[in-house]
UniProtKB/Swiss-Prot annotation:
The keyword GTP-binding does not apply. The chain crosses the membrane at residues 6-26. One of its GO terms (molecular function) is phosphatidic acid binding. The keyword Zinc-finger does not apply. The gene is uqcc3. It is found in: Mitochondrion inner membrane. This is Ubiquinol-cytochrome-c reductase complex assembly factor 3. It is a single-pass membrane protein. Its main location: mitochondrion. It comes from Danio rerio. Belongs to the UQCC3 family.
């Protein structure tokens, strides 16, 4: 009987979790509104992000190609 109680409790908990998920998930209109407000929806912002990522990638490539510790060069110069 203990196994049946655990099984019933697990199924009930799974059903409750699913019901709460359905109740609190956003509808189609809310999903569209959320997608419109994401930063990726703004073309200007996306272009800025692409440029920033390209600069960071170039810095990482330069750092990988050198044997110097470039992190020490940005601190106080002695």
């Amino acid at each position: 009987m203990s196994g049946m109680r655990i099984l019933t409790g697990s199924v009930a908990l799974g059903g409750l979790t699913y019901a709460i998920w359905i109740i609190f998930s956003p509808g189609e209109e809310r999903k569209k509104e959320i997608l419109k407000s994401l930063p990726e929806a703004n073309p200007v912002r996306m272009e800025e992000t692409r440029k920033r990522n390209a600069i960071m990638l170039q810095v990482l490539k330069d750092a990988a190609e050198t044997n110097d510790n470039i992190a020490r060069g940005f601190g106080s110069q002695k």
